[in-house]
Amino acid sequence: MKKIDRSSKVRTGFHQAKWDEPVIFELSKHGERGILVNKADPKVAEAVEGVSALPEFLKRKEAPALPEISQPRVLRHYARLAQETLGADVNIEIGQGTCTVKYSPKVNDQLANLPQMREMHPLQDESTCQGIMEIMYNTGKYMCEISGMDRFSFQPSGGSQGILGMASLVYAYYKSRGEEKQRNEIITTIYSHPSDAAAPHVKGFKIIYLHPDENGYPDYEAFKAAVNEHTAAFFVANPEDTGVYNKNVLKFTKLVHEAGGLCAYDQANANGLLGVTRARDAGFDMCFFNLHKTFSTPHGCGGPACGAVGCTKELEKFLPAPLISFDGEKYYYDYETTNNPAAIGKIREFNGVAPVVLKAYAWIR
């Protein structure tokens, strides 16, 4: 079969539609509706006080500024906007920042939108959530196999929050050893994601930036000079945002470990490495994956995110609570594993974005 060269047709030769499309608020017509909401059942209305139970300061003084618009008009509006965009459905090679974006199977969106998933509530009793808890537990097992780590948390809801989770693990580890004041420096490279510096800075660490050598790799001699008794951890994306993979990364992680530090792997650029190498094999103590990049769930404005954080057995007790465990008969929210004064507690409410984990599970399977 003849290979089709789409580069000139899609990227440089792309001709987008041009619509003089108003913003959706300008399409609003008073009294127009896209859906008619049923009135509450009398028994429900009687049992629930509704607005009258709200304190006065929470009650609106006027109606919200929402467009009044029919379904066909909404459909045409967003279809026209989509025609003006070179999106992932038109060309999978589209770049979003430094991201390598996978195809997000549409069937997975349908799966996540099933009533059994969509209508669940995070405060349900765990006995009624065994299905999704099993999926989250097993997805964590898959992540461990892919990365070489021992335990994962899906609580962080994005890449930067995943890096913040790793920075929190680093701080918790040294706090448990009484070394949090001494170990106050994080080394990262200038071509790693900016969050690899920003998130540890939020946790109070001093950031040491590493520049590349003449070959584009992180400068190892400069790295050796930077590592000392104050080094808490090495945070790095590999490959970096230049697309260059540091084949000598094991030398870097070994040096940090010899100095008593930890190594954290930003795997936002992991698409090209799956099945080739693993974070643990490269000497890292923790890592995170963007499920919304590497495991096919929609990225950016296409949907919610998850920055899954994994770590070694030694660091497991510091992970966000609760974890999900299995006792041989049922899955349960595990607060005991992380029940220690140094544990980082919560990164966000509840246990992460469950539909994102479900989509990643389906893609892996």
Predicted segments, located by residue:
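Short loop-beta-helix segment that forms the pyridoxal 5′-phosphate
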Residues: 128, 141-168
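Short acidic-aromatic active-site loops that bind/stabilize oxyanions
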Residues: 67-71, 125-137, 156, 160, ...
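Conserved PLP-enzyme active-site core in the AAT-like
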Residues: 131-134, 161-332
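N-terminal glycine-rich, Lys/His-bearing helix-loop that initiates the first secondary-structure elements
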Residues: 1-119
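Gly-rich Lys/Arg/Thr-decorated short loops/hinges at beta-loop-alpha junctions or inter-strand turns
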Residues: 58-59, 114-127, 145-147, 201-208, ...
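Short, hydrophobic/aliphatic alpha-helical segments
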Residues: 74-90, 139-149, 289, 332-341
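Structural motif of enzymes handling amino- and sulfur-group chemistry
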Residues: 332-365
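Conserved phosphate/anionic-ligand binding catalytic regions in large, soluble enzymes, centered on
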Residues: 87-109, 154-166, 295-310, 350-362
